[in-house]
Amino acid sequence: MKLLVFSTVIPTKKNLRVKTFETLHKALKKRIPTELIWVVYQPDQFEKIMMDDQTIYCIQDFNDGVDLLKKLNPDLVLVPNRKEPIQHSASLAGKTLGIPLIGFSGAKIDNRLFGEKFENMKVEGQTRAAFKKLLQNKLPADSEEQSKFLRRARFFLYKYRFFIKTQLSVKRNIFKIFFLLLRDFVNFGSSASLPFNTSLDHYLLHDKLEVGRHQYYGIPAEKISVVGNPLLDDIFHKISTVKTRTKINNQIKILIFTDSLYEHGIWSYKERESFLKNLFGKLQEDKTILFDIKIHPTTESETYYQGLFKKLGLSAKIFQSEDLYDLINNYDIIVTYGVSTTHTELSLCGKKTILISTKHLPTFLLVDEAIKAELIRQCNNFMDLIPLIHDFHEQEINLTNEFIEQRDKYFYKFDGKSGKRAADSIIQFFETMKSKSN
């Protein structure tokens, strides 16, 4: 079976989408021979990459979605259930060419991302952040060397041209194309969610709570499979390895998890610089505290942090591609900020975490519950950070029964087998479609 998927990064970089597809591919291969075809959409062109039973193509090798599917000829196409321009182009082409389409809930820890403070996210702030992002000279996954004038805006226009050319290839009415163009730009300006894609042949959902949402859009129950979240499989197997570090002398080892608030247009360059200088400066005041940092694996620049450390005279280690679970047992406490799926992972594994308040950002799923269970402590002022670290270091923490109940409520079948269930559903759908075509 040839399965086509899309990514914003070459899959040697391990973002959430890449991890999702790798989990599915691993589960599929246990059942049937499966070739995973990647199409990467990014501004820079690259040559085709071959890796065992995976092939990686550049979006710029194709004129539009129809051209792409004709050349790659997949058996199935896996796309999100929202209409992102490139992947929606593939779904339009798939409908025209008769190639089956499977929708998935997205490469997220959970679709209900935010906790109780979500109402604090103002639409005005989101709109401003959206346009700040568009005017940036880099995409989130770019290095400093890739920075070019309005690179992000120009690539946004490239994606939309690709989408328009696909619509013309499938003979969509020109007035409808214009209407959709206008609607999408209004949605972008207001930071509205991408439109729901109701034209897919089957849907893989994270949990039962999503079923009603899909049926609201007219998706019949027979087109839906609730499989759980494949991203959680790896977390399920790794959280049992998380341990408390053995105390050595009076030293406290801190690992700082940064957040790409600047790269996503929420912070300005100066805001990021000021926050980090204040954070590092405060930690340096206590000689018993040693710290290193873990930056985002794809969206943050290691070069930036190396330059900042040199400017501040810091010798801390900078981790980027390393797995969270390979690092945290070497540290007593995690210090973090912003809004990140990493916060949900830290909640799940019960690692001592201090969350520094930043603006009025919401919390991700399960973080509020972890705060209530005292697995996560909040810091609202840098003046309180050092005493909080020492107090938390002496405290013993355990997963409470109430916390475990909430975890099981939020995550459908948190058992490490979601990838297998998704693979079983994909294969069953594939065989059904194949028998119909024969």
Where do the protein language model's features map onto the residues?
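Conserved catalytic-core segment of nucleotide-activated headgroup transferases in glycan assembly
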Residues: 14-26, 231-308
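Catalytic donor nucleotide-activated moiety binding site of glycosyltransferases and closely related
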Residues: 38-55, 160-171, 257, 280-321, ...
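A donor-sugar binding/catalytic signature common to diverse glycosyltransferases
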Residues: 76-89, 215, 321-367
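C-terminal alpha-helical cap of glycosyltransferases
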Residues: 414-438
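Donor nucleotide-activated moiety binding/catalytic core segment of transferases
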Residues: 54-72, 297-343, 348
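N-terminal pre-catalytic "stem/leader" segment of glycosyltransferase-like enzymes
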Residues: 1-133, 139-154, 263, 268-269, ...
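Catalytic binding pocket for nucleotide-activated donors in carbohydrate/polymer assembly enzymes
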Residues: 338-414
